[in-house]
UniProtKB/Swiss-Prot annotation:
One of the primary rRNA binding proteins. Required for association of the 30S and 50S subunits to form the 70S ribosome, for tRNA binding and peptide bond formation. It has been suggested to have peptidyltransferase activity; this is somewhat controversial. Makes several contacts with the 16S rRNA in the 70S ribosome. SMART domains: Ribosomal_L2, Ribosomal_L2_C. It comes from Borrelia recurrentis (strain A1). One of its GO terms (cellular component) is large ribosomal subunit. GO terms for molecular function: rRNA binding; structural constituent of ribosome; transferase activity. Belongs to the universal ribosomal protein uL2 family. This is Large ribosomal subunit protein uL2. GO terms for biological process: cytoplasmic translation.
Length: 277
């Protein structure tokens, strides 16, 4: 999917770029039975207090229900009926129509086109877009949408352009290299989808103007040094001051290089090599 640039008829268009959406199917509304309403919480928790700052507004969205597991369709071929836009995530989604008539959305892998036949299960061919247990995928193949727990559905590597690589297989576990550089052991019966996640040009898009951030539901970010002392540890001072201390969050936690992972987390035993910091 290419990048569209604009003639600078206004100052805000000078740096704005968008995706061209050439790969999307024309004239396709989302399947109503696979969508549901999504209420914007504007960063508030159940008591109405702000739990995530700088959220609110934005365009109304409907949630597309994605089949991250594909376990109940083992051995049933499916045809890719459409490639659609999803406002709730960075990759596009593919509408699958199974031979038994059922319809599901999945994350659209790179290279999958309308009319392709996809399958899931341990006996599925080694082909981009097919979902297989990790033990059935050859070493060196790229995968995405990787399960961590059997039956829970894919949790790892779901963002646009992402992929992991099968490094080794030993006993009950398969070693996978994740996009962060972390090498992790995952149980061999967990499902993964072959290939890369599509829409790889997403990372090259320039928002270009403040208004587009508002369309996406992102509100302005105020610097700590521009606040009062009551609002932030960096606040206050006469004139423009630099904060006077090492960078911290509004609650005093160091913001640069501070390790936040628990020292004795249960999943440490599955991590062969920590991520690249």
């Amino acid at each position: 999917m290419g990048i569209k640039i604009y003639r600078p008829k206004t100052s805000s268009l000078r740096y704005k770029t968008t995706l061209s959406f050439d790969e999307l199917s024309k004239g396709n509304d989302p399947l109503k039975s696979l969508t549901k309403g999504k209420v914007s919480r504007a960063g508030r928790d159940s008591s109405g207090r702000i739990s995530v700052r700088r959220r609110g507004g934005g365009h109304k969205r409907r949630y597309r229900e994605i089949d991250f597991a594909r376990r109940d369709k083992f051995g049933i071929p499916a045809r890719v009926a459409a490639i659609e836009y999803d406002p709730n995530r960075s990759p596009n989604i593919a509408l699958l129509v199974y031979r038994d008539g059922d319809k599901r959305y999945i994350i659209a892998p790179k290279g999958v086109k309308v009319g392709d036949i996809l399958e899931s299960g341990p006996n599925a061919p080694i082909k981009i877009g097919n979902a297989l247990p990790l033990e059935n995928i050859p070493v060196g193949k790229m995968v995405h949408n990787i399960e961590l727990n059997i039956g829970k559905g894919g949790q790892l590597v779901r963002g646009a352009g992402g992929y992991a690589m099968i490094i080794a297989s030993d006993g009950d576990y398969v070693t996978v290299k994740l996009p962060s550089g972390e090498m992790r052991m995952i149980f061999k019966k967990c499902i993964a989808t072959l290939g890369e996640v599509g829409n790889e040009d997403y990372m090259n898009v320039s928002i270009g103007k403040a208004g587009k951030s508002r369309w996406l539901g992102r509100r302005p970010k105020v610097r700590g040094v521009a606040m009062n002392p009551i609002d932030h540890p960096h606040g206050g001072g006469e004139g423009k001051t630099s904060g006077g201390r090492h960078p911290v969050s509004p609650w005093g936690q160091p913001a640069k290089g501070y390790k936040t992972r628990k020292k004795n987390k249960y999943s440490d035993k599955f991590i062969v090599k920590r991520r690249n910091n």
